[in-house]
Curated annotation (Swiss-Prot):
Protein name, entry field: Inositol 1,4,5-trisphosphate receptor-interacting protein-like 1
Keyword presence, Transmembrane: yes
Molecular function via GO: receptor ligand activity
Cytoplasmic side: 118-547
Chain ranges on the Extracellular side, renumbered to this chain: 17-96
Subcellular location field: Cell membrane
One GO cellular component, as annotated: membrane
UniProt organism field: Rattus norvegicus (Rat)
Role noted for this protein: Functions as a ligand of CD3E, inhibiting TCR-CD3 complex signaling to regulate T cell activation. Induces stable CD3E-NCK1 binding, thereby preventing the CD3E-ZAP70 interaction and subsequently inhibiting the activation of the downstream ERK-NFkB signaling cascade and calcium influx.
Gene designation per UniProt: Itpripl1
Lineage per the UniProt record: Eukaryota, Metazoa, Chordata, Craniata, Vertebrata
């Protein structure tokens, strides 16, 4: 019986808690394993209930048969006897008090062993799911005091919101997916032509582009979809490496410098025996020095990659590449002046035009965090400072949400409705530019997507989720605290590749400037109340200027 009990506990542990192979399992396997674990748990629970019922019925039947036969030796209730034997002892044995004590110790040991296994299993589960959220956070979002929602009274109905979306947003972005696909294809064509031109030059190499921003993340409104941002990663040529020197984020700016240096495999690998390194051999050192010196002279300032020089070099490359591929397209391409991005303007004969911004980026390690050439709005950087960008990480997160969420979810509609109204909002008197930006609303939405199950974002819940989004941002304004979605977010799925230090870092407050500037905070609150007024009068007030 002891061996059977131990084997039963081991089988139960293996069935309920399969061993995890790696922290970074792919998403499909993760979803299937969770579904299988849930189904097996339900089946095991049902089998345990049936086993207990059958055991109880068999025991009662046996007692009844013994009673009618007059055999009451095993009936403790009739005889008032107490079985002092060890629970796992054979019926013919009598262990006495010592056996009873050993039996209790055996049961206690098995219980402790099972408890240790359970604690270890819980400590090994670090992978957060989109559907999972802590109880405290879920209560924080879903169980809100009634007084907190008083300023959301008179909110439009589901039908009114759907009607607004259909007439003012859906038609305006109908062709957006096809346009995004064309933009990426066109930029890839230009990059391939640039590679042909730069084969014999010791200059940075261009990798495949990645569309980022509102248009490619499918939440852009008419105003946001007039421009397309495309990230173009660059890597050093052979024999050269980029060394990222990050600035101290406590100084208020997240950026870094890209140092250019020579590279050789012998610096990273231990060569066996008396092996000659061709790069560092005196016959090839001149060639290596010439390659590195060429980049430093053309693109660097004090051995660091210069944003302005690098962008100008890239603009010249694109201009020359256009001459190779112009015969494929039926539009006119111009390059408006810019110091931090390579801007492209496509003018069609029909009068339609597209604006594309090519942003250069240097990848941080094996993550989707890049040091980019384009600085955020309202911030000034030196020519050797490359701002840190999380656009690729956020793009991946929203893409994964769309993959795992039910069909026809409303999370992007919530953002589009708010931004459509904000685009046609008049600024408060004396204000030169808005305080609340589309990135603030997008950040609030991504926080809610992690805290609420994806099943709560179904199409019929548009009105409730829009209220949640406005409440979340309104509470953040009251507290003057809106945390960055990626930095210091311990609930971020491990499938989003960011530097490990970011997960355990202190959260970054995007509203820190509102703490230091009461005037800006007052303007942000006024903008928010104006937005609420627009939402509440949505059914009966067309947008100024139309869409």
């Amino acid at each position: 019986m002891a061996v059977i009990s131990l084997l039963f506990l081991a089988v139960m542990y293996v069935v309920h808690h399969p061993l995890m192979v790696s922290d970074r399992m792919d998403l499909d396997t993760l979803a299937r394993s969770r579904q299988l674990e849930k189904r097996m748990s339900e089946e095991m629970r049902q089998l345990e209930i049936e086993f207990e019922e059958r055991s109880r019925a068999a025991e009662e039947k046996q007692k009844a048969e013994n009673f009618w036969r007059g055999d009451t030796s095993n009936d403790q209730l009739v005889l008032g006897k107490k079985d002092m034997r060890w629970p796992f002892q054979a019926s013919g044995q009598d262990g006495g008090p010592l056996g009873w004590m050993l039996g209790n110790l055996w049961n206690a040991g098995l219980f402790c062993l099972f408890l240790i296994f359970e604690l270890l299993r819980q400590n090994m589960q670090h992978e957060p799911a989109f559907e999972s959220s802590s109880e405290e956070e879920e209560e924080e979002i879903r169980v809100v005091p009634v007084s907190s929602y008083t300023w959301l009274s008179g909110f439009p109905s589901q039908e009114a919101l759907e009607s607004f979306y259909k007439h003012y947003i859906q038609n305006a972005i109908r062709d957006l997916p096809c346009t995004c696909e064309f933009v990426e294809s066109f930029v890839d064509d230009l990059i391939e032509a640039c590679r042909v031109l730069s084969r014999r030059e010791a200059h940075p190499q261009l990798e495949d582009c990645l569309g980022i921003g509102a248009a490619f993340e499918k939440w852009g409104t008419l105003h946001e979809t007039q421009k397309f941002d495309v990230l173009v990663p660059i890597v050093p040529p052979q024999g050269t490496m980029f060394i990222l020197e990050m600035r101290d984020p406590t100084l208020g700016r997240r950026c870094g410098c890209v140092k250019v240096d020579s590279e050789c495999v012998c610096k990273n690998e231990k060569l066996l025996g008396d092996v000659l390194c061709l790069v560092h051999h005196r016959d090839h050192s001149a060639m290596l020095s010439k390659c590195t010196s060429s980049i430093k002279a053309a693109l660097c300032t004090s051995s660091h990659l210069d944003v302005y020089k690098t962008v100008q070099w890239f603009r010249n490359m694109v201009s020359n590449a256009w001459a190779l591929v112009a015969h494929k397209y039926d539009f006119k391409l111009t390059l408006p002046p810019s110091t931090t991005t390579c801007k492209l303007r496509l003018d069609y004969r029909s009068g339609r035009s597209l604006s594309i911004s090519l942003v250069l980026g240097v990848q941080r390690e094996d993550t989707l965090v890049y040091l980019v050439s384009q600085a955020p709005e309202r911030e000034q950087f030196t020519s050797v400072d490359w701002p840190e960008s999380f656009a690729a990480c956020e793009h991946l997160f929203l893409k994964l949400v769309g993959r795992f969420a039910p069909d026809n979810t409303c999370h992007l509609k919530c953002l589009q409705i708010i931004l459509s109204l904000q685009d046609h909002q008049t600024l408060p008197p004396g204000a030169s530019r808005p305080i609340l930006t589309s990135y603030h609303f997008k950040t609030a939405l991504m926080h809610l997507l992690l805290r609420l199950p994806l099943t709560d974002w179904q199409h019929r819940m548009l009105s409730q989720r829009l209220q949640d989004l406005l409440w979340f941002l309104g509470r953040s304004l009251q507290q003057r605290s809106l945390h960055h979605f990626l930095i210091g977010n311990t609930h971020l799925p491990l499938t989003i590749p960011i530097p490990k230090a970011f997960r355990n870092a202190e959260p970054v407050n995007l509203f820190q400037h509102l703490v230091l500037n009461p005037v800006a905070h007052s303007q942000a609150v006024e903008e928010f109340h104006n937005l609420l007024a627009q939402v509440k009068t949505l059914p009966c007030s067309p947008l100024a200027g139309g869409l």
